[in-house]
Protein backbone atom coordinates (compact mmCIF):
# COMPACT_ATOMS: atom_id res chain seq x y z
CA UNK A 1 0.00 0.00 0.00
CA UNK A 2 2.84 2.35 0.90
CA UNK A 3 4.58 1.59 -2.40
CA UNK A 4 1.41 2.35 -4.36
CA UNK A 5 0.91 5.64 -2.50
CA UNK A 6 4.51 6.68 -3.10
CA UNK A 7 4.19 5.84 -6.81
CA UNK A 8 1.02 7.93 -7.06
CA UNK A 9 2.66 10.88 -5.28
CA UNK A 10 5.82 10.67 -7.37
CA UNK A 11 3.83 10.33 -10.59
CA UNK A 12 1.61 13.28 -9.68
CA UNK A 13 4.65 15.43 -8.93
CA UNK A 14 6.26 14.60 -12.26
CA UNK A 15 2.95 15.25 -14.04
CA UNK A 16 2.69 18.72 -12.53
CA UNK A 17 6.29 19.58 -13.40
CA UNK A 18 5.99 18.31 -16.98
CA UNK A 19 2.59 19.88 -17.70
CA UNK A 20 3.91 23.03 -19.49
CA UNK A 21 6.16 20.84 -21.63
CA UNK A 22 3.28 18.57 -22.65
CA UNK A 23 1.04 21.59 -23.32
CA UNK A 24 3.54 23.04 -25.79
CA UNK A 25 4.16 19.63 -27.34
CA UNK A 26 0.45 18.99 -27.97
CA UNK A 27 -0.07 22.38 -29.64
CA UNK A 28 2.94 21.75 -31.87
CA UNK A 29 1.66 18.26 -32.74
CA UNK A 30 -1.66 19.73 -33.88
CA UNK A 31 0.27 22.15 -36.11
CA UNK A 32 -0.36 25.39 -34.25
CA UNK A 33 2.55 27.75 -34.86
CA UNK A 34 1.74 31.22 -33.45
CA UNK A 35 5.30 32.48 -33.88
CA UNK A 36 6.91 32.92 -37.32
CA UNK A 37 10.09 31.05 -38.28
CA UNK A 38 13.43 32.71 -37.58
CA UNK A 39 16.93 32.32 -38.92
CA UNK A 40 19.01 30.32 -36.47
CA UNK A 41 21.72 27.68 -36.32
CA UNK A 42 21.36 23.93 -35.95
CA UNK A 43 23.51 21.71 -33.71
CA UNK A 44 26.22 21.69 -36.40
CA UNK A 45 26.35 25.48 -36.52
CA UNK A 46 24.78 25.70 -39.98
CA UNK A 47 22.40 28.61 -40.61
CA UNK A 48 18.84 27.34 -41.08
CA UNK A 49 15.25 28.56 -41.00
CA UNK A 50 13.76 27.16 -37.81
CA UNK A 51 10.74 27.53 -35.55
CA UNK A 52 10.88 28.88 -31.98
CA UNK A 53 11.62 26.29 -29.31
CA UNK A 54 9.97 25.27 -26.05
CA UNK A 55 10.78 28.37 -24.02
CA UNK A 56 9.66 30.87 -26.67
CA UNK A 57 6.46 28.93 -27.19
CA UNK A 58 5.76 28.70 -23.44
CA UNK A 59 6.47 32.41 -23.10
CA UNK A 60 3.88 33.14 -25.79
CA UNK A 61 1.23 31.09 -23.95
CA UNK A 62 2.08 32.79 -20.64
CA UNK A 63 1.81 36.22 -22.27
CA UNK A 64 -1.82 35.45 -23.21
CA UNK A 65 -3.11 33.29 -20.34
CA UNK A 66 -0.50 33.99 -17.68
CA UNK A 67 1.75 31.40 -16.06
CA UNK A 68 -1.28 29.60 -14.72
CA UNK A 69 -2.36 29.03 -18.31
CA UNK A 70 0.63 26.73 -18.81
CA UNK A 71 -1.12 24.22 -16.54
CA UNK A 72 -4.30 23.97 -18.62
CA UNK A 73 -5.57 20.38 -18.66
CA UNK A 74 -3.74 19.43 -15.48
CA UNK A 75 -6.79 18.11 -13.58
CA UNK A 76 -7.85 15.40 -16.08
CA UNK A 77 -4.19 14.50 -16.62
CA UNK A 78 -3.69 14.02 -12.88
CA UNK A 79 -6.84 11.87 -12.75
CA UNK A 80 -5.49 9.82 -15.64
CA UNK A 81 -2.11 9.38 -13.97
CA UNK A 82 -3.48 8.37 -10.57
CA UNK A 83 -6.08 5.97 -11.99
CA UNK A 84 -3.57 4.49 -14.43
CA UNK A 85 -1.02 3.85 -11.66
CA UNK A 86 -3.63 2.12 -9.50
CA UNK A 87 -4.97 -0.08 -12.32
CA UNK A 88 -1.46 -0.98 -13.52
CA UNK A 89 -0.42 -1.93 -9.98
CA UNK A 90 -3.57 -3.99 -9.35
CA UNK A 91 -3.11 -6.04 -12.52
CA UNK A 92 0.54 -6.82 -11.71
CA UNK A 93 -0.40 -7.60 -8.10
CA UNK A 94 -2.95 -10.12 -9.36
CA UNK A 95 -0.24 -11.92 -11.34
CA UNK A 96 2.13 -11.92 -8.36
CA UNK A 97 -0.54 -13.41 -6.11
CA UNK A 98 -1.35 -16.11 -8.68
CA UNK A 99 2.36 -17.00 -8.85
CA UNK A 100 2.51 -17.35 -5.06
CA UNK A 101 -0.59 -19.54 -5.16
CA UNK A 102 1.05 -21.86 -7.70
CA UNK A 103 4.24 -22.08 -5.62
CA UNK A 104 2.28 -22.98 -2.47
CA UNK A 105 -0.09 -25.35 -4.30
CA UNK A 106 -0.73 -29.02 -3.36
CA UNK A 107 2.25 -31.31 -3.74
CA UNK A 108 4.64 -28.33 -3.75
CA UNK A 109 6.18 -29.64 -7.00
CA UNK A 110 9.43 -27.92 -7.92
CA UNK A 111 9.04 -26.23 -11.29
CA UNK A 112 11.76 -26.08 -13.88
CA UNK A 113 13.53 -22.76 -13.99
CA UNK A 114 12.51 -21.15 -17.25
CA UNK A 115 15.10 -19.69 -19.58
CA UNK A 116 15.82 -15.99 -19.37
CA UNK A 117 14.15 -15.42 -22.75
CA UNK A 118 10.98 -17.19 -21.60
CA UNK A 119 11.08 -15.02 -18.49
CA UNK A 120 11.34 -11.87 -20.64
CA UNK A 121 8.33 -12.96 -22.72
CA UNK A 122 6.31 -13.77 -19.60
CA UNK A 123 7.10 -10.48 -17.83
CA UNK A 124 6.63 -8.40 -20.99
CA UNK A 125 3.25 -10.01 -21.65
CA UNK A 126 2.11 -9.22 -18.12
CA UNK A 127 3.38 -5.66 -18.38
CA UNK A 128 1.61 -5.29 -21.73
CA UNK A 129 -1.71 -6.42 -20.24
CA UNK A 130 -1.28 -4.11 -17.23
CA UNK A 131 -0.42 -1.10 -19.41
CA UNK A 132 -3.21 -1.82 -21.87
CA UNK A 133 -5.77 -2.06 -19.06
CA UNK A 134 -4.54 1.23 -17.59
CA UNK A 135 -4.61 2.93 -21.00
CA UNK A 136 -8.11 1.66 -21.79
CA UNK A 137 -9.55 2.91 -18.50
CA UNK A 138 -7.76 6.28 -18.47
CA UNK A 139 -8.11 7.19 -22.15
CA UNK A 140 -11.27 9.31 -21.64
CA UNK A 141 -9.27 11.57 -19.29
CA UNK A 142 -6.49 11.70 -21.88
CA UNK A 143 -8.96 12.87 -24.54
CA UNK A 144 -10.30 15.60 -22.23
CA UNK A 145 -6.73 16.71 -21.42
CA UNK A 146 -5.83 17.08 -25.10
CA UNK A 147 -9.01 18.92 -26.04
CA UNK A 148 -8.75 21.34 -23.12
CA UNK A 149 -5.24 22.19 -24.34
CA UNK A 150 -6.09 22.47 -28.04
CA UNK A 151 -8.94 24.92 -27.41
CA UNK A 152 -6.23 27.52 -26.73
CA UNK A 153 -5.93 27.85 -30.52
CA UNK A 154 -9.47 29.10 -31.10
CA UNK A 155 -9.83 30.64 -27.63
CA UNK A 156 -12.83 28.38 -26.94
CA UNK A 157 -14.09 27.34 -23.52
CA UNK A 158 -15.86 24.14 -24.52
CA UNK A 159 -13.75 21.78 -22.38
CA UNK A 160 -13.09 23.69 -19.17
CA UNK A 161 -14.40 21.63 -16.25
CA UNK A 162 -13.94 17.87 -15.93
CA UNK A 163 -17.65 17.10 -15.43
CA UNK A 164 -18.74 19.57 -18.13
CA UNK A 165 -16.26 18.02 -20.57
CA UNK A 166 -17.58 14.52 -19.89
CA UNK A 167 -21.16 15.69 -20.51
CA UNK A 168 -20.15 17.55 -23.70
CA UNK A 169 -18.34 14.57 -25.22
CA UNK A 170 -21.13 12.14 -24.35
CA UNK A 171 -23.82 14.48 -25.72
CA UNK A 172 -22.03 15.20 -29.02
CA UNK A 173 -20.17 11.95 -29.76
CA UNK A 174 -21.54 9.29 -27.44
CA UNK A 175 -19.38 6.69 -25.68
CA UNK A 176 -17.03 6.34 -28.67
CA UNK A 177 -16.00 9.97 -28.29
CA UNK A 178 -14.16 9.09 -25.07
CA UNK A 179 -12.00 6.61 -26.98
CA UNK A 180 -10.99 8.73 -29.97
CA UNK A 181 -7.40 7.87 -30.89
CA UNK A 182 -7.28 4.79 -28.63
CA UNK A 183 -6.19 2.23 -31.26
CA UNK A 184 -2.92 3.92 -32.37
CA UNK A 185 -2.13 4.73 -28.73
CA UNK A 186 -2.50 1.08 -27.69
CA UNK A 187 -0.51 -0.14 -30.70
CA UNK A 188 2.27 2.34 -30.00
CA UNK A 189 2.49 1.36 -26.32
CA UNK A 190 2.57 -2.36 -27.12
CA UNK A 191 5.17 -2.04 -29.89
CA UNK A 192 7.34 0.24 -27.77
CA UNK A 193 7.25 -2.16 -24.81
CA UNK A 194 8.12 -5.27 -26.82
CA UNK A 195 10.80 -3.46 -28.81
CA UNK A 196 12.37 -2.03 -25.66
CA UNK A 197 12.43 -5.31 -23.72
CA UNK A 198 13.57 -7.39 -26.70
CA UNK A 199 16.45 -5.04 -27.51
CA UNK A 200 17.43 -4.85 -23.83
CA UNK A 201 17.49 -8.66 -23.64
CA UNK A 202 19.68 -8.93 -26.75
CA UNK A 203 22.10 -6.27 -25.49
CA UNK A 204 22.30 -7.73 -21.98
CA UNK A 205 22.73 -11.29 -23.24
CA UNK A 206 25.08 -10.91 -26.19
CA UNK A 207 26.75 -7.50 -25.90
CA UNK A 208 27.55 -7.18 -22.20
CA UNK A 209 30.17 -9.23 -20.38
CA UNK A 210 28.48 -11.10 -17.51
CA UNK A 211 31.73 -11.07 -15.55
CA UNK A 212 31.78 -7.28 -15.17
CA UNK A 213 31.28 -6.14 -11.56
CA UNK A 214 28.92 -3.35 -12.62
CA UNK A 215 26.66 -5.69 -14.60
CA UNK A 216 23.42 -4.57 -12.92
CA UNK A 217 24.29 -0.93 -13.50
CA UNK A 218 25.09 -1.62 -17.15
CA UNK A 219 21.76 -3.41 -17.57
CA UNK A 220 19.85 -0.42 -16.20
CA UNK A 221 21.68 1.84 -18.67
CA UNK A 222 20.90 -0.48 -21.57
CA UNK A 223 17.23 -0.56 -20.55
CA UNK A 224 17.11 3.25 -20.55
CA UNK A 225 18.83 3.50 -23.95
CA UNK A 226 16.63 0.86 -25.59
CA UNK A 227 13.55 2.51 -24.05
CA UNK A 228 14.52 5.85 -25.58
CA UNK A 229 15.20 4.20 -28.95
CA UNK A 230 11.85 2.38 -28.87
CA UNK A 231 9.94 5.54 -28.00
CA UNK A 232 11.58 7.36 -30.92
CA UNK A 233 10.57 4.61 -33.36
CA UNK A 234 6.98 4.45 -32.13
CA UNK A 235 6.48 8.22 -31.84
CA UNK A 236 4.28 8.37 -34.98
CA UNK A 237 1.66 6.33 -33.10
CA UNK A 238 1.64 8.94 -30.32
CA UNK A 239 1.26 11.76 -32.83
CA UNK A 240 -1.56 10.05 -34.75
CA UNK A 241 -3.37 9.15 -31.52
CA UNK A 242 -3.30 12.73 -30.24
CA UNK A 243 -4.43 14.13 -33.59
CA UNK A 244 -7.35 11.69 -33.77
CA UNK A 245 -8.37 12.55 -30.19
CA UNK A 246 -8.99 16.19 -31.17
CA UNK A 247 -9.92 15.77 -34.83
CA UNK A 248 -13.30 17.18 -35.86
CA UNK A 249 -14.41 17.67 -32.24
CA UNK A 250 -15.79 21.17 -32.74
CA UNK A 251 -12.57 23.00 -31.87
CA UNK A 252 -10.61 25.22 -34.25
CA UNK A 253 -7.46 23.19 -33.55
CA UNK A 254 -9.14 20.02 -34.80
CA UNK A 255 -10.33 21.51 -38.09
CA UNK A 256 -8.68 23.10 -41.16
CA UNK A 257 -6.38 24.95 -41.59
CA UNK A 258 -4.64 23.51 -38.53
CA UNK A 259 -5.77 19.95 -39.15
CA UNK A 260 -7.57 18.20 -42.02
CA UNK A 261 -10.63 16.09 -41.24
CA UNK A 262 -9.39 12.49 -41.10
CA UNK A 263 -11.70 9.55 -41.84
CA UNK A 264 -9.63 7.15 -39.71
CA UNK A 265 -6.30 6.94 -37.92
CA UNK A 266 -4.85 5.15 -40.96
CA UNK A 267 -5.92 8.08 -43.14
CA UNK A 268 -4.21 10.42 -40.67
CA UNK A 269 -1.04 8.28 -40.74
CA UNK A 270 -0.93 8.22 -44.55
CA UNK A 271 -1.44 11.97 -44.84
CA UNK A 272 1.28 12.78 -42.30
CA UNK A 273 3.63 10.35 -44.02
CA UNK A 274 2.91 11.92 -47.40
CA UNK A 275 3.67 15.40 -46.01
CA UNK A 276 6.80 14.22 -44.17
CA UNK A 277 5.36 15.28 -40.81
CA UNK A 278 5.55 11.96 -38.94
CA UNK A 279 7.94 13.40 -36.36
CA UNK A 280 6.12 16.71 -35.82
CA UNK A 281 6.38 17.70 -32.18
CA UNK A 282 8.99 15.06 -31.38
CA UNK A 283 11.64 17.72 -30.83
CA UNK A 284 11.04 20.94 -28.90
CA UNK A 285 14.40 22.46 -29.84
CA UNK A 286 16.12 23.04 -33.22
CA UNK A 287 12.73 22.64 -34.88
CA UNK A 288 12.74 22.65 -38.67
CA UNK A 289 9.88 24.27 -40.58
CA UNK A 290 7.34 21.50 -41.37
CA UNK A 291 5.97 20.97 -44.84
CA UNK A 292 2.82 22.78 -45.95
CA UNK A 293 2.15 24.54 -42.67
CA UNK A 294 0.08 27.71 -42.35
CA UNK A 295 1.19 30.15 -39.66
CA UNK A 296 -0.90 32.53 -37.64
CA UNK A 297 0.91 35.50 -39.18
CA UNK A 298 -0.03 34.16 -42.65
CA UNK A 299 -3.68 33.80 -41.64
CA UNK A 300 -3.80 37.40 -40.39
CA UNK A 301 -2.47 38.61 -43.73
CA UNK A 302 -5.23 36.71 -45.54
CA UNK A 303 -8.03 38.17 -43.41
UniProtKB/Swiss-Prot annotation:
Ranges in the topological domain labelled Mitochondrial intermembrane: 2-15, 93-135, 200-231
Biological process (GO), any one: positive regulation of intrinsic apoptotic signaling pathway in response to DNA damage
Any GO molecular function: membrane insertase activity
PROSITE patterns: SOLCAR
InterPro entries in UniProt: Mitochondrial_sb/sol_carrier, Mt_carrier_dom_sf
Keywords of this entry: Acetylation, Membrane, Mitochondrion, Mitochondrion outer membrane, Repeat, Transmembrane, Transmembrane helix, Transport
Gene3D superfamilies xrefs: Mitochondrial carrier domain
UniProt Solcar repeat ranges: 2-98, 118-206
Localization terms from the record: Mitochondrion outer membrane
Cytoplasmic membrane side: 37-77, 157-180, 253-280
Chief location of this protein within or outside the cell: mitochondrion
Modified residues (N-acetylalanine): 2
Membrane-topology annotation of the record: Multi-pass membrane protein
Sequence intervals crossing the membrane: 16-36, 78-92, 136-156, 181-199, 232-252, 281-303
A cellular-component GO term for this protein: membrane
Similarity-based family: Belongs to the mitochondrial carrier (TC 2.A.29) family.
PANTHER family: MITOCHONDRIAL CARRIER HOMOLOG, MITOCHONDRIAL CARRIER HOMOLOG 2
Entry function: Protein insertase that mediates insertion of transmembrane proteins into the mitochondrial outer membrane. Catalyzes insertion of proteins with alpha-helical transmembrane regions, such as signal-anchored, tail-anchored and multi-pass membrane proteins. Does not mediate insertion of beta-barrel transmembrane proteins. Also acts as a receptor for the truncated form of pro-apoptotic BH3-interacting domain death agonist (p15 BID) and has therefore a critical function in apoptosis. Regulates the quiescence/cycling of hematopoietic stem cells (HSCs).
Subunit note: Interacts with p15BID.
Name of the featured protein: Mitochondrial carrier homolog 2
Amino acid sequence: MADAASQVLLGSGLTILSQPLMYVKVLIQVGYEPLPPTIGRNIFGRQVCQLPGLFSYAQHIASIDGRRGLFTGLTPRLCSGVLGTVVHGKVLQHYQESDKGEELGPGNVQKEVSSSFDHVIKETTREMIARSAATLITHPFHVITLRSMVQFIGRESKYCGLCDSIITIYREEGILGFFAGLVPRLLGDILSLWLCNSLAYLVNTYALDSGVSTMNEMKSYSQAVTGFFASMLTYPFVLVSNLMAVNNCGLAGGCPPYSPIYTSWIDCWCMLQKEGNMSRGNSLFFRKVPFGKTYCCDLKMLI
